[in-house]
UniProtKB/Swiss-Prot annotation:
Its EC number is 7.1.2.2. This is ATP synthase subunit alpha 1. It comes from Listeria monocytogenes serotype 4b (strain F2365). F-type ATPases have 2 components, CF(1) - the catalytic core - and CF(0) - the membrane proton channel. CF(1) has five subunits: alpha(3), beta(3), gamma(1), delta(1), epsilon(1). CF(0) has three main subunits: a(1), b(2) and c(9-12). The alpha and beta chains form an alternating ring which encloses part of the gamma chain. CF(1) is attached to CF(0) by a central stalk formed by the gamma and epsilon chains, while a peripheral stalk is formed by the delta and b chains. It is a peripheral membrane protein. The keyword Transmembrane does not apply.
Amino acid sequence: MKTIHFDMNKYETHVDLEYLKEHGRVEKISDGVIFCSGLENAALHQAVLIDERHRGVILELNEEFVGIGLIDKTNDILEGMHVGVSGKFIEVDLFEEMAGRVIDTTGKMLYEESEEKPTATSPLFCVTPAIMTIDSVTRPLNTGLAVIDSITPIGRGQRQLILGNRQSGKTQIAVDTIINQHDQNVHCIYVAIGLKAAYIAEVIETLRNHGAMEYSTVVATAASDSLTAQYLTPYAGMAVAEALRDQGKDVLIILDDLTKHADAYRAITLLFNRPPGREAYPGDSFYIHSSLLERAVQMNEEHGGGSITAIPMIETLSDDVTAYIPTNVISITDGQLFLKSDLFNRGQKPAVDVGVSVSRIGGDAQHPIIRKLSKNLTLILSQFEELKELLDFGNALDDGSMKMVSDGRLLTELFKQKILSPLSVTELIVILYAFQNGFLTKIPPANIQTFKDLLLEKAHMHKDFESFSAQIETINELNESHIEMLEEIIREAGRLFS
């Protein structure tokens, strides 16, 4: 057998292995993601630059290629272009004053130009706070919505899901909650994920018109933005929230909505040829939401005492809460508010289905007076829903059952609330006290809204109500003077109404 001798010197091309560790080449482009060779030292979620001008982030690592998602939507990227690792993980820029800003995934100002330089950065992806650094949820975050603050209260540091069909009032609850924080020393962050640009502008305008942008930040990507930008948006919002929390502040973050976030992630993973699972979502869909929402906590005093309260939203189809993403997020959060289209269409706004909605830890943070006045409200509404079905079939009911129906109908009307008109804690106390002590039984349900407006008007005219409101945080129980004041308000409203 003849031996073959190779002359290695004839191969003049020299491969610089060190260069390939930090640099790569675009091999394939596909709908906002690129497949890249090289980048041997690449790490997940590292920021990269394509052709030294297009921003991207590493989202996929395997033996064959490095998968990069493009943050900016562009058609200028070509095969063969240079890809360089920045050496940093993806971050959002922070500024001296975050209130009033509308930013994108990386902290860049939207809708207006700014010469201001960022003062710091915050990583989009980080480890959840250690269990020894967090504290119990003991302080309320009032939404200003009677049905929520009384039956499914939310505490600072809690994760409370809002889910419901399209056009069932989810965003309106979030906007009302933000507006209600005007004097609560809470910094609000509204995160818009893949929504229509006109819709985002409408929400911003509403917040601005009610003075809420003075203590709010908006992190937004529109439906026309890249899939990667939509996927990164909630993490950018949470990164801003963590920076504020580390300053000892209380933060409320609204995630509108995680269904679109999951859809964007599903599209990205399918483009990277990852095997699909249930409903074509990838196997780590639960992880992307749990790793995000578990960053919303109440820190203990040794670690600043700040908090992040997260209110994610999920869009359901035909009120189906058993679908993959809704069940995932329900199991991650501390409770949920389920909005029913049927209730919304009947004029019950907010359209909260009390039978399915729950707040597992918010009761510990509820104001003691509200907690006492709300103790049997869920039972009243549940009994009303059961007995109402019997009435629909023309069944005769005894006097006790008819009283339950009457109370339920009264409470249902009492919980109806106009948009952008949140109630303070003391206003809610007036309303609940009037209901629980039988002052509303003679008022027809159709007139409840008119009487409620009159009741609140008389409350603000009472000489002692302002001082009562100022001291409410330190009052744990109604004394004789408080009860006398409440009954004077109710009697005066009743006298004028009759």
